[in-house]
């Protein structure tokens, strides 16, 4: 019994060390060091097309009307600099027809105004995609809601389309489950305020909605993956829609 007890203690200690060193903790986001990057009154520090973006009742609002339908996705971009390792918290509300997302470690396209290419924490009004990791204008879906995935290392650059099938990156290994997509969907409120918490450190990206982990990606693809880039919020092409974002706070490491 003494040997078993000591053995269990040693195993527990190893687990605690591993968790502390290698797994970003959601609770870290509640610590000090967060900076508010949207003042709730103006678009100071942000840049986008005023046809689609405005401030209303303390929220950053992206809206498409019947008179302003889009031909391509549009972003409002945070001009506070590039982000590398960080945590981001915010709240969102989106109409049922809505399609949006929070882009990070993204690249601004030179030939298209207010267009970003990069990782995205997906948001949509039907909650079909909310919480997943989607790479805009690049490798497409890296993890569906409920998945823990590892993106395989690539040996050489090549056409991305060679590794995309059904709008998902095929060079991906699912290494674990965070719960079924349908069960996690029940935790996301429709047309009401939901909380987003992103933890991005090294090649690990965790997407939380309402304090529940929705997707977990480890990106070992050094050719196509990005270690830093821009932050932005998307309005997606499609029917009229509205997304509201508030209480945007960033903590950089």
Predicted regions and their residues:
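Bacterial N-terminal signal peptides that target proteins for export
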Residues: 1-12
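C-terminal motif of bacterial Sec signal peptides marking the signal peptidase cleavage site
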Residues: 19-20
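Carbohydrate-interacting regions of secretory-pathway proteins
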Residues: 23-253
């Amino acid at each position: 019994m003494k040997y078993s007890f000591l053995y269990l203690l040693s195993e527990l200690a190893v687990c605690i060390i591993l968790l502390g060193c290698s797994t970003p903790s959601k609770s870290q986001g509640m610590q000090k060091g967060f900076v508010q990057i949207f003042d709730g009154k103006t678009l100071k520090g942000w840049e986008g097309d005023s046809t689609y973006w405005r401030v209303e009742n303390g929220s950053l609002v992206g809206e498409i009307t019947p008179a302003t339908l889009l031909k391509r996705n549009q972003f409002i971009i945070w001009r506070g600099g590039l982000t590398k390792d960080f945590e981001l918290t915010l709240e969102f509300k989106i109409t049922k027809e809505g399609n949006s997302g929070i882009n990070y470690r993204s690249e601004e396209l030179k030939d298209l105004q207010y267009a970003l290419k990069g990782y995205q924490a997906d948001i949509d009004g039907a909650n079909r995609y909310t919480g997943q990791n989607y790479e805009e204008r690049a490798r497409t879906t890296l993890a569906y809601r409920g998945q823990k995935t590892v993106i395989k290392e690539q040996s050489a650059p090549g056409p991305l389309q060679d590794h995309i099938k059904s709008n998902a990156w095929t060079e991906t290994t699912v290494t674990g489950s965070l719960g079924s997509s349908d069960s996690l969907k029940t935790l996301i409120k429709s047309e009401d305020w939901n909380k987003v918490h992103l933890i991005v450190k090294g090649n690990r990206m965790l997407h939380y909605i309402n304090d529940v982990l929705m997707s977990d990606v480890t990106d070992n693809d050094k050719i196509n993956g990005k270690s830093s880039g821009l932050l932005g919020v998307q309005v997606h092409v499609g029917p009229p829609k509205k997304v509201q974002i508030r209480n945007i706070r960033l903590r950089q490491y």
